[in-house]
Amino acid sequence: MAQETNHSQVPMLCSTGCGFYGNPRTNGMCSVCYKEHLQRQNSSNGRISPPAPSVTSLSESLPVQCTDGSVPEAQSALDSTASSVQPSPVSNQSLLSESVASSQVDSTSVDKAIPETEDLQASVSETAQQASEEQSKSLEKPKQKKNRCFMCRKKVGLTGFECRCGNVYCGVHRYSDVHNCSYNYKADAAEKIRKENPVVVGEKIQKI
């Protein structure tokens, strides 16, 4: 009699081959496969599919169907299902920290780019100013030194006499009365005397 009861209590595997133990009341399938079977039937008939089994219902159904030898397998399956359903808080925190760090990096890069742009503009303006100065210097041709007498066109070389009127003369035509110099010596002398001898005017006496 005891052998018959032990033989009747031997559990059978799920008919779908999922690895869990089945139940005669659910057509030899486990509770999960049986619910999926019902959902497929309802979807084929056009009915609204029932909600997916929650983790709590799965945990409630597994200990009833499993024997002592299959407890570790069922527990591992339950843990894997729960870990897949529940979101990881560590991943959320890591994503939040990465977004904050990226925003900080963007702000620092913008702050660094502003002074770099100002320095670049200053260097460009300085370069343009230097180029314009060099161009103006190159356009100014050096004046050729006159080496001939303005009156007789005699070549005087380094022995010529340069007058205040701006021309070069030889030893004969170097005097102002000879070459009819256009420079006004009287006005120059009067201006020099005026600068060297300023007019001194005393203060007026105030009557008491």
From Swiss-Prot:
**Listed SUPFAM superfamilies:** AN1-like Zinc finger (SSF118310), Glucocorticoid receptor-like (DNA-binding domain) (SSF57716)
Modified positions (Phosphoserine) are 49
Cystine residue pairs: none
Where are the compositionally biased (Polar residues) regions?
A: 54-68, 95-110
| Assembly information from the UniProt record | Interacts with PKN1.
A20-type zinc finger positions in the chain? Answer: 8-42
Question: Could you identify this protein by its name?
Answer: AN1-type zinc finger protein 6
In residue numbers, where are the AN1-type zinc fingers?
Answer: 143-189
Q: Transmembrane region positions?
A: none
Give residues annotated as binding Zn(2+) 3.
163, 165, 179, 181
Q: Which residues carry this modification: N6-acetyllysine?
A: 204
* PANTHER family recorded: AN1-TYPE ZINC FINGER PROTEIN, AN1-TYPE ZINC FINGER PROTEIN 6
- Annotated region Disordered: where? 41-110
| Residues that hold Zn(2+) 2 according to the record | 149, 152, 170, 173
Residues that bind Zn(2+) 1: 14, 18, 30, 33
The alphabetized list of GO BP terms reads: protein targeting to peroxisome
Question: Could you tell me which InterPro entries the record lists for this protein?
Answer: AN1-like_Znf, AN1_A20_ZnFinger, Znf_A20, Znf_AN1
Q: What SMART domains does this protein map onto? A: ZnF_A20, ZnF_AN1
Q: Which GO terms describe its molecular function?
A: DNA binding; polyubiquitin modification-dependent protein binding; zinc ion binding
Pfam families xref list: zf-A20, zf-AN1
Recorded superkingdom: Eukaryota
Q: Which UniProt keywords apply?
A: Acetylation, Metal-binding, Phosphoprotein, Zinc, Zinc-finger
